[in-house]
UniProtKB/Swiss-Prot annotation:
This protein's UniProt keywords: Cytoplasm, RNA-binding
Chain segments carrying region Disordered: 279-313, 398-427, 492-549
Molecular functions per Gene Ontology: RNA binding
Biased composition range(s): Low complexity: 303-313
Location within or outside the cell: Cytoplasm, P-body
Protein name: Protein PAT1 homolog 1
Family recorded in the similarity comment: Belongs to the PAT1 family.
Comp. bias (Polar residues): 398-408
Keyword Cytoplasm: yes
Amino acid sequence: MEEVKKYGKTLEEIEGGLMFDDFPESLVDSDEDHNIFDDEFDAANDETFGGGLDNIGENAELENYATQTAKLRFDDPVWQKPSSSDHVAPSASEIPIPFPNFGNGDASDSFKSSFEAESPFLKKSIWGNGTDGAYNIWGTNFGISSVPAAPTLDLDFGALLPTPTIQATKEVKSSQIPSMPSSALTLEDCERMQMGNKPDSLVDAFKDLQLGSTPVQPQSAQFSKHPLEARIAAPGTPATASSQALPTLPTAALSLEELELQIMKEAQILKGRQQVPSDMREDNKFSHPPPGFNQNVQPRMDPSLSPGGMHGMPPSMGTSMPHMGPMMPPQNMQLPRLPPLNPQFLPLIPVWFNAIINNIQLPMGVPPPPPFLFQLLNHYRNPQLVHAMIMQSSIPPNIRQNGPQFSHPSGPHSPGNRVQRKHSGMPSTRTIYDLALDSFAGYMSYKEREWLIRIQFIQCKGSGDPQVDDYYYVTWRDKQIANGWTAETKLEEATKEKKEKSSESQKDYLERISRMNYREMQKERARERDKERQRERQERIDRGEDKKLRQTLSDKFATSLGLPSKSSTHNPRHVLDMKAQVESVDNQTKKLSDEERKIAVAKKLRTMLLRLEGALNILMEVDELRRSSLPEKSQFKDLSSDEKDQEVEKRTTVIINELMGDDLSKLMQMSKGRAVITRTLKVVEPRDQARIILALMTAGGLVSKKMYGEIVLDILPVVYQKVSNLHPDQFKYLVGALNLDTLKRQLLDSNMFIRDMMMTLFFVSVKNNQQLVEWAKATKFSSLKMPSSAPLSIWRKALSVISDSEIKEFADDIKYSGIVDCHDVAQLIEQSL
């Protein structure tokens, strides 16, 4: 019992000594920034593949561990006294989690210890000790070291796992644990005694097993022991003679190679299921745990995704778990509290992070990043975590979203893609996207802009020499002084203006006041107009010109619903008017508003244009039918000449019936409509040509006078060509079909189109020896001179194919024809030359 008290230790001291006493000195003495995960280890050695298991019994410290802990007694009073050992057990929070990938499923396990750690920054105020305002976040006294510059900020964003902080334990005097009595109980025996179970014979047999002579270990023996015992007692178990007789292995047992193969296959299948897309990995720049934040915890894997054969597998068995995304705190987890930040600065936090991390220039109008952001990033090394802490501390819970949300800006306008968006020949990488913040974006670089601003500042300051700074004004002023002008001070000008105002009359004063008050002036004008209207109305009433019939109340409200009216037995009050009233189209058009009228006109114009497009397509088919040789792909290639003529007649008849009716006047006022008319005249037969000419002369009276010139220039040349080619009988039929009354009325209305058409018919009749002139003389046809005496310059321009000599002969024939106003008409013809 005395021997047990002499070497008595607590369980924490024993576990701490086993975990930290033999820690490699090279790692203890190394720098904290050294990342042991970056070291390369050679796997092709005897240690990895079990080549040194034969000499494992040489370690006396582990060899005697079973005998040292054989007779431990928890009811002994020595466990209640402080330990006299020099070994100090570390805190439980500093012990690494054995298997972090197979936890209890609680997502907050990985974050509790880090958030509960003491931080020197959290004890300070982000507003500073020397600040005067509540929102001065750019103070200088923070109680911590000075703020580092943005380029030197050491944010380890490239490492997969954080740099672990290795804590060196106390230097031990001896690397060996003193031997314990052989009768001491082991940890396993103590557990069995507490549970009320007896020691297992299989475990006793396993203790005496010689590990060096056994290539394969039964699977049941691997998992029958406690993990701590399997890790501590197995390597140091001494070999005995009785251990050579091994128990027979079951037929379904797996060898070490087969077990390793099975584990690797399952890991590959799991890795394929959980493969993260490449675009997601590129967009999330902060997808790893922050250094100093949950240092000894690997990414937690969802237990539901792990295969059945991998439960309880330690990380050292050769399989590497796939990366399961960023280590971010759960949504409802309470983060460390910071002093609240002004809400107006919350939208600027991502902009400041981008400027600090990417070392880019801040947009115009954005203040510089406050110093506390540098300190938070230096402490936590995770922009996502810092952003979540600030947002949780600054936004009330009732309006805050669940969990911190922070997404790094990405896309074509992100800072990382500005180099890719630079256009060739442009001095800047910024485009029109940045014009809202910088009017010089895309035209000059930042340095060029600074240089331009400096030059402008220098120009604004001036050199002090008026001849250099403002040469033109100085020259002009010298000339004015030379001409007798004297400069007056502002005080003298104000005094002079005041005198002018004081000397103004009452009328001038009222005019000036009325100009100053525009509303009063408008009201006064309205009152004057009302007085003028009343005066004119009274004058008309006095003259008897404006006597309105007095309308009784009954007549006014008759046939009105719900309004009083005089009723009797013979004339009852009309509650509802049952008479059918059909308003005309003109009345409906008048009721339309200006906007509705515009919409209606636009619809009609669109319909007319669609009809013209259809007519042009038909004319193109007619031109194709008129060709002597048709292409191979033509749909009319197999038709005979008679069939082609029939197809042409069908199509021209459709155009004449559809367009040469009531809508012809509208077509004549449209350039595309006139093109359809002229093309139709060129392809139809003479009989149809006469029909079209008669329709044109009938619709000419409905055309606006402003369009006469354009209509004559477009239509008259084709009409002259086709009328000249008519047979005398056909020409006689055309003249006989004219409506004389309509023509006379249109000539009296100074219709230039009808005058020019009749002048063309007279010219063709004289040229072809027709009797039209004699017919006009006999019928006393209206004069072509017209009351307005409009010149024939447009008619002559339209008939430019006729020579001047022919025009002179035509003028002489008209002069001696004996028609009405023959001399005046001949004079007009000669003036057109």
